[in-house]
């Protein structure tokens, strides 16, 4: 597949033609390098703590229970803070690490026998190549998105995911290859990334909120996109002045969704999870009692309202027409068009509903952004389906999707 996202892109096709696979690939390509510095720091800290914990337990009988719990964490903190603030040279890491450990052990009456073993491991951790970390975390992200089934089942072909972002100032490109579900980064390693992708799958994330409150096992079976989506719904962000101004401009859409469709909003309850507050009845409505069609509007309202979706991000919606009457399909299409037109958020939508696809096409024309629309249809080619650009002839989509009605 070769997909362009200049504004709103629709991928149409029958069930089982690979639409969701493309959506997952876009999601992984955009997000795999997100917060790379934070991931590396967390991994370094955890690895150093593990080494220190094992070494300290082997050499010491702790009388102080709090010291037993905290010693390895405090030591790791001291080492990493000094490493970053003093900008240690590679040749200095061993000696400085050894000094910190010896001083800590002396101050806390701890045995520092065989100190060479943990120091060598810590030096190895801090000297690890950046490219190794990026390779590990990018592959891990793809594996989690695809549940360890990245390559098509039953084929030995190598898969490629190429991601390119072009704007007025620069061009960013990254590529990965996947062979036997193992990933390799092609070309230059990229670590900086500002945009974010949010993926709304066909099931409703709100149904998992009640499971979290009840400690249900079902909550542990969430996909990675849904886990990230739930986190975005529940987050409370500290915004900069510029971000605050942008968020305030976004409130027009939030207000319109609440006023015309949801008549309520999500809010945190005393347990720290979220609930839906219905303005009409002035009370809480259980998610299991909400209209299924109402949930996607509620999710979009929250994502825009709490600044989880911001200018330049990518919103991916998988078959959003599920549980929606054609009237609400049109309403959703208009909201998605406004999200792009007014907020500058790119939208990728998979669909097999001719109503929804036509509504996107019409609303983009109404909002004078039709040129930023792309339409693809999944066509069978030998043993696979390929995406075909039908932007100039969307009737191909409608002819195929209306065909079952013609058979009646």
Across the structure, where does each feature detected by a protein language model lie?
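Phosphate-coordinating catalytic segments in nucleotide- and nucleic-acid-processing enzymes
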Residues: 32-305, 310-312, 385-408
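Switch/communication elements of ASCE P-loop NTPase nucleotide-binding domains
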Residues: 1-39, 275-406
């Amino acid at each position: 597949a070769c997909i362009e996202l200049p504004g709103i892109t629709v991928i149409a096709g029958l069930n089982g033609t690979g639409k969701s696979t493309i959506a997952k690939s876009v999601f992984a390509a955009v997000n795999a390098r997100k917060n790379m510095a934070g991931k590396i720091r967390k991994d370094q800290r955890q690895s150093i703590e593990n080494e220190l914990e094992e070494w300290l337990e082997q050499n010491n009988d702790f009388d102080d229970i709090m010291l037993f719990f905290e010693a390895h964490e405090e030591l790791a903190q001291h080492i990493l803070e000094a490493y970053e603030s003093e900008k240690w040279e590679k040749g200095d890491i061993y000696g400085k690490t050894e000094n910190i450990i010896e001083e800590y052990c002396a101050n806390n009456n701890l045995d520092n026998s065989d100190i060479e073993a943990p120091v060598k491991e810590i030096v190895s951790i801090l000297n690890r190549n950046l490219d190794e970390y990026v390779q590990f975390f990018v592959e891990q992200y793809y594996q989690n998105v695809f549940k360890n089934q990245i390559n098509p089942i039953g084929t030995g072909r190598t898969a490629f995911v190429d991601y390119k972002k072009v704007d007025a100032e620069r061009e960013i490109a990254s590529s990965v290859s996947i062979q036997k579900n193992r990933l390799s980064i092609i070309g230059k390693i990229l670590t900086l990334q500002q945009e974010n992708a949010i993926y709304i799958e066909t099931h409703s994330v709100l149904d998992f909120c009640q499971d979290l409150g009840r400690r249900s096992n079902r909550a542990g079976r969430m996909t990675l996109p849904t886990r990230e989506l739930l986190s975005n719904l529940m987050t409370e962000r500290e915004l900069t002045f510029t971000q605050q101004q942008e968020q305030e401009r976004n409130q027009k859409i939030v207000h319109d969704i609440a006023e015309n469709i949801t008549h309520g909003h999500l809010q945190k309850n005393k347990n720290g999870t979220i609930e839906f507050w219905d303005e009409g009845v002035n009370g809480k409505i259980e998610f299991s009692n909400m209209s299924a069609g109402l949930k996607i509007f509620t999710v979009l309202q929250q994502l825009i309202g709490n600044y989880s979706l911001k200018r330049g991000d990518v919103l991916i919606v998988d078959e959003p027409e599920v549980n929606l009457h054609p009237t609400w399909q049109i309403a959703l299409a208009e909201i998605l068009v406004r999200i792009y037109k007014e907020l500058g958020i790119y939208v990728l939508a998979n669909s097999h509903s001719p109503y929804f696809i036509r509504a996107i096409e019409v609303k983009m024309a109404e909002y004078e952004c039709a040129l930023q629309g792309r339409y693809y249809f999944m066509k069978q080619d030998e043993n696979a389906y390929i995406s075909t650009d039908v932007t100039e002839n969307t009737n191909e989509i409608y002819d195929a999707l209306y065909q079952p009605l013609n058979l009646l």
